[in-house]
Amino acid sequence: MSPPESVRHISVLGREAVDWLAPRDGGVYVDATFGAGGYSRAILTIDGTRVIGIDRDRTAIAGGFDLVEQSDGRLTLVESRFSQLAEVCASQGVGQVDGVVMDVGVSSMQLDQAERGFSFRFDGPLDMRMGHDGFSAAEVIAAASEADLANIFYIFGEERHSRAVARAIVAARAETPIVTTKALADLVSKVVHSKPGEIHPATRSFQGLRIFVNAELDELHLALTAAERVLKPGGRLVVVSFHSLEDRIVKNFFAERGKASSGSRHRPEMAQQQPSFAILTKRPVTPSDEETAANPRARSAKLRAGERTAAPAQPEAPLPHWPTLASVMGRR
């Protein structure tokens, strides 16, 4: 059964994303963040296209079954992380594809479901997992050290008051477990103050915790390099991101792949690498005034796109050294 219209995820920059993807008859495309299927639905309007939809959220996969039935076998849905898109394609007998589109971050559907624990706007269990495995946000809040919590809020949430927030959490959890979104939001609001018209005091802390719980930035790094490997020459990669951390990763990825490398004595395998992407969007595409008026969550969205060249995929760079679930929860 499809989710009701009230909880359907609106594909931000949906028309622009599909325009830059430029699907064509007979092409095979990966919708790496299926959500409510907005991109997939648009791609399937082109006769002869095939879509592999990926989402780590089994609720989204279940919600797409109607579209699968309507697609006459042209849509396949797979529950997986988008960092695994190359393996997913291989499992479907697909070696290379004509395009990959991804909408990075939490979906409106997830934000609007109180039981998922993503939003401070609704009281619910402090969960925040996009999938259904791994540590929940409540478990991280209960177990992480004060220093680790401060790093999580500062690095992933860009919260200037991260140390004060972490200190308040450690003091509060010694008295009562913090297991609901309201409890955490109320606690953060006592430490971080905002003026009328500014974002909610808990916005950055919730963002940082969510990104950490889902390893979102690592996933994005891996998904971009996976897309590079599976795209045919002439295939397109289109990425919509929603905050500066994500956009910086996407921008740097295209910048590195969009120019020839002269090599590095630190990474000899990079010698004489030719550009693996031609950058299509010299500047990010942003939503129109009409779209942001209809969907305020779109206001921070940025779209970047590139076209795969015939050059070999560039070697995968090491992931940045930032807090991970394995390192933080392993220190309990």
Swiss-Prot record:
Domain of life: Bacteria
Residue numbers spanned by region Disordered: 281-332
Gene Ontology annotations for the cellular component aspect, listed alphabetically: cytoplasm
Residues at which S-adenosyl-L-methionine binds: 37-39, 55, 82, 103, 110
GO biological process, one term: rRNA base methylation
Family: Belongs to the methyltransferase superfamily. RsmH family.
Function field: Specifically methylates the N4 position of cytidine in position 1402 (C1402) of 16S rRNA.
Protein name, UniProt field: Ribosomal RNA small subunit methyltransferase H
EC code: 2.1.1.199
Major site of localization recorded for this protein: cytoplasm
Compartments it resides in: Cytoplasm
Keywords: Cytoplasm, Methyltransferase, rRNA processing, S-adenosyl-L-methionine, Transferase
